[in-house]
Design a protein with these regions (language model features):
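Alpha-helical cap/lid subdomain in secreted, periplasmic
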Residues: 1-96, 100-118
Length: 119
């Protein structure tokens, strides 16, 4: 068993070895709120993902912050509907919001090359 960072570096290297573009995404935030804002885990998983991306020269999409900002704009009551079973796993509607965020950022990272694969 290895660390989160070890596995992320391994995935980046394996991706590149196959000629693909490595993109690391931080985890999306859980449905945890304080003072009207969703909690960001900027000092653990999101930070570690960003550090590996920087160390390996991979693209990084900070879903923790990007999705949290969207959740904040929607509000706690609306976002609660995305998490019917627990505060970690979204339903399809929540997954679609996350997916739209990833697609939006892929279009910005390397215009043209990866965007052609997105609908």
């Amino acid at each position: 068993v290895h660390t989160f960072g070890w596995y992320m570096r391994k995935y980046v290297r394996e991706t590149r070895a196959r000629g693909a573009t490595a993109i690391i995404c931080s985890l999306v935030p859980r449905n945890n709120w304080k003072d009207g804002k969703v909690f960001r885990s900027a000092d653990s998983w999101a930070l570690w993902a960003k550090q590996v991306a920087e160390q390996e020269g991979a693209y990084f999409i900070d879903l923790n912050e990007l999705v949290a900002a969207k959740y904040d704009a929607l509000g706690e009551t609306a976002v609660k509907k995305f998490f019917p079973a627990d505060n970690t796993h979204t339903n399809e509607e929540g997954a679609r919001l996350n997916m739209a965020t990833v697609m939006e950022m892929i279009r910005k990272i390397k215009p043209g090359s990866l965007a052609k694969y997105l609908k």
